[in-house]
């Protein structure tokens, strides 16, 4: 039998966002500021919800969970990217790569389920206000949250296990700023067809399920809103739904474009820009979107500031 002299790679190079040295320090500073604001704002929102009994309702229970997931995703991707802006050696080991991918896939999938859960919560609040406390009880809220995190964990675990069937023996250059799944497939020596198929089936099914849940929830909510005769009631309902609809649009927009865009070198660059948006920018925007136009959150923050001044 012929001896197989193929050397399997256990380290990779992340190309990052730019090859131009003059851009590295400005980008480092920009993303460092974004990361710090993201962490402070999301953790601050969690602390605010935790400490104010008036915010201990399902809407803010899920919002606090979303803030945690946003901080998780940002912390999974951004620190390594910041290090690579300054480091001459942008290597990442296979084990580190797998940990980063699992952590990101877990957070991203959990966020999809949380957005769908929050849409259902708004549907019940608008369409069945009298039954809201009965339907959205503590038991259901905990089960919905557990389902979201368990779904994220299992989805990430399945892809993680399937990645270990791949071998890497030619190029060790990952054209991305973090270990995402598709760039890993592109440098695999093993045929990744099964992996691509599972991404299409599992990730596609999750996105379709969560998007349909959001659309159905807000379609019924919209019809209920339009039946309201009170202008104040209509404004309040739209205000309640507006922040979540904006967050959903920002999150799913780049993902949908990535799936629909044909493969090309230009598409790879655009995919990286889209990845920056939903891994770094959206975790920054979500707490701002949900906080700035939310009277209860603003009032709670104001009371907290007055207590501590």
From Swiss-Prot:
Glycosylated residues are: 5
Chief localization class?
Answer: membrane
Residues crossing the lipid bilayer are 29-49, 57-77, 98-118, 144-164, 194-214, 240-260, 272-292
Which top-level group of life is the source organism from? Eukaryota
Note the topology in the membrane: Multi-pass membrane protein
The compartments listed are: Cell membrane
Keywords noted in UniProt: Cell membrane, Disulfide bond, G-protein coupled receptor, Glycoprotein, Membrane, Olfaction, Receptor, Sensory transduction, Transducer, Transmembrane, Transmembrane helix
Q: Which Pfam families match?
A: 7tm_4
* Disulfide-bonded cysteines: 97-179
> For side Cytoplasmic, which residue ranges?
50-56, 119-143, 215-239, 293-309
Q: Name the InterPro entries for this protein.
A: GPCR_Rhodpsn, GPCR_Rhodpsn_7TM, Olfact_rcpt
Query: GO MF annotations for this entry?
Result: G protein-coupled receptor activity; odorant binding; olfactory receptor activity
A GO cellular component annotation here is:
plasma membrane
Q: Which residues lie on this side of the membrane: Extracellular?
A: 1-28, 78-97, 165-193, 261-271
**Ranges in a coiled coil:** none
Q: Function of this protein?
A: Odorant receptor.
| Alphabetical list of PANTHER family matching this protein | OLFACTORY RECEPTOR
Say which family it is in: Belongs to the G-protein coupled receptor 1 family.
Know the name of this protein? Olfactory receptor 5H2
Q: Which gene encodes it?
A: OR5H2
């Amino acid at each position: 039998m012929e001896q197989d002299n193929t050397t399997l790679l256990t380290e990779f190079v992340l190309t990052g966002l730019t090859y131009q040295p003059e851009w590295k320090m400005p980008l480092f500073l920009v993303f460092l500021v974004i990361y710090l604001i993201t962490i402070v704002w999301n953790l601050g929102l969690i602390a605010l919800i935790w400490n104010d009994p008036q915010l201990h309702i399902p809407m803010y229970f899920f919002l606090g969970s979303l803030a945690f997931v946003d901080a998780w995703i940002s912390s999974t991707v951004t620190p390594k990217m910041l290090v690579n802006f300054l480091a001459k050696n942008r290597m990442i080991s296979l084990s580190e790569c797998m940990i980063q991918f699992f952590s990101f896939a877990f957070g991203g999938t959990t966020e999809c389920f949380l957005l769908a859960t929050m849409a259902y919560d708004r549907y019940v609040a608008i369409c069945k206000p009298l039954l809201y406390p009965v339907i959205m009880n503590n038991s259901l809220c905990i089960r919905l949250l557990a389902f979201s995190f368990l779904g994220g964990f299992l989805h990430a675990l399945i892809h993680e296990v399937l990645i270990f069937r791949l071998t890497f023996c030619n190029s060790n250059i990952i054209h991305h700023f973090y270990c995402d799944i598709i760039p890993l497939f592109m440098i695999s020596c093993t045929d990744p067809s099964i992996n691509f198929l599972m991404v299409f089936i599992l990730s596609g099914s999750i996105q379709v399920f969560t998007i349909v849940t959001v659309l159905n929830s807000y379609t019924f909510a919209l019809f209920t809103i339009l039946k309201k005769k009170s202008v104040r009631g209509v404004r309040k309902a739209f205000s309640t739904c507006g922040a979540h609809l904006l967050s959903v649009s920002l999150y799913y927009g780049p993902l949908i474009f990535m799936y629909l865009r044909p493969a090309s070198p230009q598409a790879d660059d655009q995919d990286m820009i889209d990845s920056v948006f939903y891994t770094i920018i959206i975790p920054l925007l979500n707490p701002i979107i949900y906080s700035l136009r939310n009277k209860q959150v603003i009032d709670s923050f104001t009371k907290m500031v007055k207590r501590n001044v």
